From Swiss-Prot:
GO terms for biological process: phosphocreatine biosynthetic process. Residues 1-52 form the Phosphagen kinase N-terminal domain. Its EC number is 2.7.3.2. It comes from Squalus acanthias (Spiny dogfish). This is Creatine kinase B-type. Expressed in rectal gland, brain, skeletal muscle (at protein level). Its main location: cytoplasm. It is an enzyme of class 2 (transferase). Pfam families: ATP-gua_Ptrans, ATP-gua_PtransN.
Length: 52
């Protein structure tokens, strides 16, 4: 998997999806905050996990 480096982010930032969303629209949500790759990180930048 590639890491989202600043250079890669700059290349992707101005591209849009067929629906017209940009990368910034997708990773930042006004209600949830910054949406990361893991659902346990939604809006907090903290990670919660349960190990059984």
């Amino acid at each position: 998997a590639k890491v989202l480096t600043l250079d890669l982010y700059k290349k992707l930032r101005d591209k849009s999806t067929p629906s017209g969303f940009t990368l910034d629209d997708i990773i930042q949500n006004e209600h949830l905050g910054y949406v990361l790759t893991c659902p346990s990180n939604l809006g907090t930048x903290l990670r919660a996990x349960v190990h059984v």
